[in-house]
C-alpha cells in the first residue's frame, strides 16, 4: 500500500509528507530550522497572511511562529510542548507495530479533540462577550 492510500492525517506521520508542506518556508540554507529539521521535529508549515513562518506539530497541534534562523526545531518543540508524545518516539513510523502505531495515533486524536474543544470554547467566549455588550447597549437605550 502506497503512502497516498493512507488517510491524509496518517500521511503526516511520514517525514517526506511533512517536508512537502514547507514549499514556501523562509529558511532554506545556512540555518538550523530548515524544512528537513522542521519535519523531523514533527512540524508542518501552515502559513497565514500575517504569519508566513507559522508551523504546527501535526501530533500535539502546538503552533509556533516567529522563527529565527538559529532556532533548533526539536528544542523549540520540547520547550513549548514538553508533553508531545511524538518527540519521545524512538523508532521510525514504518518500524512501529500496528499496536504501537494505533496507541500513538490515539494520543494524536486526543490532542486534536482537546485543541478543537479549546478553540470552540474561545469562540463561544468571544460570542458571549459580543452578545452581552449588545444586550447592555440595548438596555442603556431604555
UniProtKB/Swiss-Prot annotation:
GO BP term, example: apoptotic process
InterPro entries found in the cross-reference section: Baculoviral_IAP, BIR_rpt
Residue positions binding Zn(2+): 57, 60, 77, 84
Subcellular location: Cytoplasm; Nucleus; Chromosome; Chromosome, Centromere
Residue numbers bearing the N6-acetyllysine modification: 23, 90, 110, 112, 115
GO molecular-function term, one example from the UniProt record: cysteine-type endopeptidase inhibitor activity
One Pfam family, short name: BIR
Residues of the site described as Interaction with FBXL7: 126
Post-translational modification: Ubiquitinated by the Cul9-RING ubiquitin-protein ligase complex, leading to its degradation. Ubiquitination is required for centrosomal targeting. Deubiquitinated by USP35 or USP38; leading to stabilization.
Modified positions (Phosphothreonine) in chain numbering: 34, 48, 117
Keyword Nucleus belongs to the record: yes
BIR repeat segments: 18-88
Primary location recorded for the protein, binned into one broad class: cytoplasm
Annotated Gene Ontology cellular component terms: apical plasma membrane; centriole; chromosome passenger complex; chromosome, centromeric region; cytoplasm; cytoplasmic microtubule; cytosol; interphase microtubule organizing center
Keywords from the named record: Acetylation, Apoptosis, Cell cycle, Cell division, Centromere, Chromosome, Chromosome partition, Cytoplasm, Cytoskeleton, Kinetochore, Metal-binding, Microtubule, Mitosis, Nucleus, Phosphoprotein, Protease inhibitor, Repressor, Thiol protease inhibitor, Transcription, Transcription regulation, Ubl conjugation, Zinc
Subunit structure: Monomer or homodimer. Exists as a homodimer in the apo state and as a monomer in the CPC-bound state. The monomer protects cells against apoptosis more efficiently than the dimer. Only the dimeric form is capable of enhancing tubulin stability in cells. When phosphorylated, interacts with LAMTOR5/HBXIP; the resulting complex binds pro-CASP9, as well as active CASP9, but much less efficiently.
Family: Belongs to the IAP family.
Domain notes: The BIR repeat is necessary and sufficient for LAMTOR5 binding.
Function: Multitasking protein that has dual roles in promoting cell proliferation and preventing apoptosis. Component of a chromosome passage protein complex (CPC) which is essential for chromosome alignment and segregation during mitosis and cytokinesis. Acts as an important regulator of the localization of this complex; directs CPC movement to different locations from the inner centromere during prometaphase to midbody during cytokinesis and participates in the organization of the center spindle by associating with polymerized microtubules.
Descriptive protein name: Baculoviral IAP repeat-containing protein 5
Source organism per UniProt: Rattus norvegicus (Rat)
Organism taxonomic ancestry: Eukaryota, Metazoa, Chordata, Craniata, Vertebrata
Gene: Birc5
